[in-house]
């Protein structure tokens, strides 16, 4: 929605729009990043088995042959920035005009999803729930470890204690994950612009300053550990420089070219974790590598 009021050398304008992109989407089979988390499970189990064999905990790798997985995953999300912009334009000369204004931004994000029932063909057998398998395995190993400790058989206690710890670790990594969270926040963007028009040429320049934003989590469900309720996360809108040039070739034909540059490196953004390695990645990872 756009409106303008013009009087003499002044023009006062306002608009309301969804700015900076945004939208909503539903992924009934989850996101690719969800799949990447689960796809490493077979290899992780085989590697864990090899490690326990090397340490003398297991005589053979009972997880060899694990090469299949499945998962029930789902994601629905939205990211919207609603902007109310007000500004004034003044005609300095017959050829040059200047604009100054501000935009009030309101961020409305929402995420709902899950990763459930991770299964694998452990040891090349039938597909089973990995979390349940290793939870039961950990309980059995812990019971055996406690019994050996009571009998003062420290060698077997150490072996079954190691099995219980490793099984508990795998069970935790493959537990169901659920998220239901909204995020809201607001910030103000100062805007400056110049417009030059002479004969058949028209040149426009606009600069939008960096918008400092924090979004606050309103979390209903989260066992991912990533969206704690009440936490504020950096969500800046980067500064933007745009330049446009047009030339009137004919009264009914114009040629134009434009350039825009987002100053991403100066904007505060939340860090993320690599879904495979678990390492924290700063914003520069995404800016430089995508």
Q: Where are these predicted regions, by residue range?
A:
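Active-site-flanking structural segment that lines cofactor/substrate pockets
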Residues: 1-2
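Outer-membrane beta-barrel porins/channels
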Residues: 6-290
């Amino acid at each position: 929605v756009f409106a303008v009021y013009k009087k003499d050398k002044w023009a006062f304008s306002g608009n309301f729009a969804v700015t900076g992109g945004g939208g909503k989407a539903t992924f009934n089979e989850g996101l690719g990043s969800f799949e990447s988390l689960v796809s490493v499970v077979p290899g992780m189990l085989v590697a864990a088995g090899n490690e326990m064999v090397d340490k003398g905990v297991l005589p053979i790798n009972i997880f060899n042959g694990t090469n299949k997985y499945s998962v029930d995953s789902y994601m629905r999300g939205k990211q919207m920035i609603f902007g109310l912009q007000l500004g004034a334009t003044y005609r300095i000369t017959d050829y040059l005009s200047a604009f100054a204004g501000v935009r009030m931004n309101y961020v409305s994000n929402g995420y709902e999803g899950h990763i459930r029932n991770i299964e694998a063909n452990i040891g090349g057998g039938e597909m089973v729930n990995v979390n349940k398998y290793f939870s039961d395995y950990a309980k059995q190993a812990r019971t055996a470890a406690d019994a050996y400790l009571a009998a003062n058989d420290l060698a077997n206690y150490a072996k079954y204690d190691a099995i219980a710890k490793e099984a508990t670790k795998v069970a935790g990594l493959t537990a169901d994950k659920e998220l239901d969270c909204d995020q809201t926040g607001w910030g103000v963007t100062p805007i400056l612009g110049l417009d030059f028009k002479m004969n058949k040429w028209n040149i426009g320049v606009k600069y939008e300053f960096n918008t400092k934003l924090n979004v606050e989590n309103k979390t209903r469900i989260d066992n991912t550990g990533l969206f704690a309720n009440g936490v504020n996360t950096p969500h800046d809108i980067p500064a933007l420089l745009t330049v446009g040039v047009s030339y009137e070739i004919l009264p009914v034909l114009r040629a134009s070219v434009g350039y825009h540059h987002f100053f991403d490196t100066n904007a505060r953004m939340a860090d993320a974790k690599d879904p495979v390695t678990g390492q924290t990645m700063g914003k520069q990872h995404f800016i430089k590598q995508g």
